[in-house]
Regions:
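Conserved acidic carboxylate
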Residues: 12
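Active-site residues of response regulator receiver
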Residues: 58-59
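Two-component/phosphorelay signaling modules centered on CheY-like receiver
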Residues: 15-35
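Short amphipathic alpha-helix used as the core "switch/output" element in two-component signaling
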Residues: 67-80
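Acidic catalytic/metal-coordinating carboxylates
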Residues: 39, 65-68
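Acidic, metal-coordinating helix/loop segments flanking the phosphotransfer/catalytic sites
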Residues: 36-54
């Protein structure tokens, strides 16, 4: 029996980084990006429709933050993805702790740990 499809939703305000994330998963067996957004409201709507297994999100978003999105997912009754991966250009300890408190499983620095996103996805 094969692995079930690894559906991924990406929330990132930078088109270049969003494209880089899509490119990082394109050749992973059974992985498919089912949607993307650059703002909290659009992400909530898209996640509700797509029900992905994995959420990859940035901290800084258009009109809000990744932390706000995670909190809204919880309070709106949206089921939590199997894995939540936060990627940021601001890898401060405060952001790392806030990510953990909001339910993120992984926290990576875009500049030095981008490859770890792919490693996590391959392990799922």
């Amino acid at each position: 029996m094969g692995r079930s499809e690894l559906t991924i939703y990406i929330v990132e305000d930078s088109p270049a980084v969003r494209e880089r994330l899509i490119e990082a998963v394109v050749d992973i067996p059974n992985a498919r990006v089912v949607g993307s957004a650059d703002a909290v409201g659009d992400a909530l709507e898209g996640m509700r429709a797509a029900r992905p297994r994995v959420l990859i999100l940035d901290v800084q978003l258009r009109g809000g933050s990744g932390f706000r999105l995670l909190k809204l997912m919880r309070t709106s009754g949206l089921s939590r993805p199997e894995a939540v991966i936060v990627v940021t250009n601001y890898p401060t300890e405060d952001y790392r702790n806030a990510s953990r408190e909001c339910g993120a499983d992984h926290f990576f620095d875009k500049a030095s740990e981008f490859h770890k996103v792919r490693e996590v996805l391959l392990a799922l």
